[in-house]
Amino acid sequence: LNGETGASSNGSKAEAPADQKTKTPAIGLTSEPSIEKSTLLASIKNGGYIIYFRHTTTERDYADQADPLMSLDDCSSQRKLSTQGIKESYEIGMAFAAKEIPVGEIIVSEYCRSWKTANLAFGEWTQKDSRLNFLPYEDYTKSHVELMKKNVMPLLSRAPLPGTNKVIIGHDDPFEAVTGIYPEPQGIAYILQPDGGKSFKIIDRVLPSEWATL
């Protein structure tokens, strides 16, 4: 884990779980999709899933959480969505509307790129939750990773409102802390099926451009 840079804390390049059967040690599941894309839409239209997005593409990719000048109250001090990221957000929202995917809660981090992705895609967000934030370090210790896992796990394992899907728009490192999967590229979504208790099952992953073709 290394602050949205895709590198691990020991300086080596992070694993590339998006295309491999990577073991997710935090929950003991494999990241291989367990459902065909052709049936994914029908499943999520029934509700009951957590859809975790990493925010869409930014102009630059660096660990701004470690910048002492960064303020969560000042968007100008943070990474900004790029033209591509703005387009991705709009297209995700249009696909959800066109395919009538039911959305209940929309939970975002306190970072501007997170809630702006939500505003562009869905026109709103329900709740800002600091548990989705980065810890203010570029490199994380084992205790930092455990803290992020403790913070985020309840959000991923709690069932959504009946007949809806819960959308979470967050960041890479907190998601990796819980699942062992580095969410790449920016804008990728993971479909999770919570057990209503302390865990969940990873169902599939969807790239920003794939929502329109489900």
Model-derived features: where do they sit?
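Generic beta-sheet signal
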Residues: 48-50, 161-170
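Signal peptide processing junction and immediate N-terminal pro/mature segment
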Residues: 1-18
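Short, surface-exposed amphipathic charged segments that create phosphate/polyanion-binding patches used
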Residues: 140-149
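Short alpha-helical segments and helix-capping/turn motifs at coil-helix boundaries
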Residues: 35-38, 152-153, 176
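Active-site-proximal alpha-helix that buttresses catalytic centers in soluble enzyme cores
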Residues: 16, 22-130, 135-139, 181-214
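A short, structured loop/turn motif at beta-sheet edges
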Residues: 158-163, 195-196
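Histidine-centered catalytic micro-motifs
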Residues: 53-58, 168-175
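A short, acidic, amphipathic alpha-helical segment used as a generic capping/interface helix at domain edges
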Residues: 148-160
